[in-house]
């Protein structure tokens, strides 16, 4: 941790030996900038489409159950949870988090940092949290079966649990928990919804150029050419406003699976994934591809 220009900056350093010397990766956390961004962070700014935003808000206002956010590393999962905490943080409820690391401190929220050297793991921390009379719990990440089991039991016993797990889409989450040996009945009984997300770059509005996409490119993207052949497309160019990159900022695209009774019954019956996906889309789910 360093003080630079009256700012507190944290550095997470990972060093790995290689045949050509040490490979170093540094993650920079500007806490003052994060504080400014998070203080103004609302779910509307994440990038939800209106229907997914409405459904996600409904899920995080339920008194109990589990809300799962999934995606690869660096897809904005923690930012989404922080936006949810900003809306959930009221005087009526006691909210406790366990994170690795705590990237931003919320007023009125009990936040616990993971410290494996001192024995504070996600699983042990979560067990301790349950003895502190929480109403809502945020678990930074589910990494093992023990943490998953405790989180599920917490959701089944009257707590709202928000957490993340690494998976490619909303349906892979089910397989991920199954691979941990988690009982499907309890897992589905606890689960309110699954949100999958990705971060995409935004074309610089100052220099983006209008182009006509080629048929091969449209089809390679998994889109129907006849449907999108007249759609205007833009591409990055680069200017002084975006430092020649062609992009300015990022936004989130989402895929929201509401665990309705019909979806749960299909999963319990081990119906093919294609049928479950078709049912979810019929119920209004917008996929990441869409």
Give the predicted meaning of each segment:
Residues 1-290:
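Short, flexible helix-loop junctions that flank or precede catalytic/ligand sites
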């Amino acid at each position: 941790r360093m003080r630079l220009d009256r700012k507190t900056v944290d550095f997470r350093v990972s060093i790995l030996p290689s045949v050509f010397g040490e490979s170093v990766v540094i993650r920079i956390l500007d806490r003052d900038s994060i504080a400014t961004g998070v203080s103004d962070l609302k779910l509307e700014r994440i990038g939800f489409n209106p229907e997914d935003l409405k459904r996600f808000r409904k899920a995080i206002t339920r008194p109990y159950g589990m809300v799962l956010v999934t995606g690869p590393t660096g897809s904005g999962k923690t930012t989404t949870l922080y936006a949810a905490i900003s809306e959930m943080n009221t005087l009526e409820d006691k909210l406790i988090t366990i994170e690795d690391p705590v990237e931003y401190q919320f007023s009125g929220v009990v936040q616990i940092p993971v410290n494996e050297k001192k024995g504070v793991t996600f699983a042990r921390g979560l067990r301790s949290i349950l003895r502190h009379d929480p109403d809502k719990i945020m678990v930074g990440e589910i990494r093992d079966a023990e943490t998953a089991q405790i989180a599920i039991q917490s959701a089944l016993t009257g707590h709202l649990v928000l957490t993340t797990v690494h998976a490619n889409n909303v349906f892979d989450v089910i397989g991920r928990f199954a691979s941990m040996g988690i009982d499907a009945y309890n897992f589905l009984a606890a689960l309110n919804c699954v949100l999958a997300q990705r971060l995409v770059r935004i074309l610089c509005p100052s220099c983006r150029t209008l182009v006509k996409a080629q048929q091969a490119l449209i089809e390679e993207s998994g889109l129907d050419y006849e449907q999108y052949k007249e759609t205007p497309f833009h591409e990055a160019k680069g200017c002084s406003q975006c430092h020649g990159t062609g992009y300015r900022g990022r936004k989130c695209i989402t895929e929201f699976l509401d665990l309705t009774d019909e979806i749960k019954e299909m999963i319990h019956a081990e119906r093919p994934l294609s049928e479950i996906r078709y049912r979810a889309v019929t119920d209004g789910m917008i996929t990441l591809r869409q």
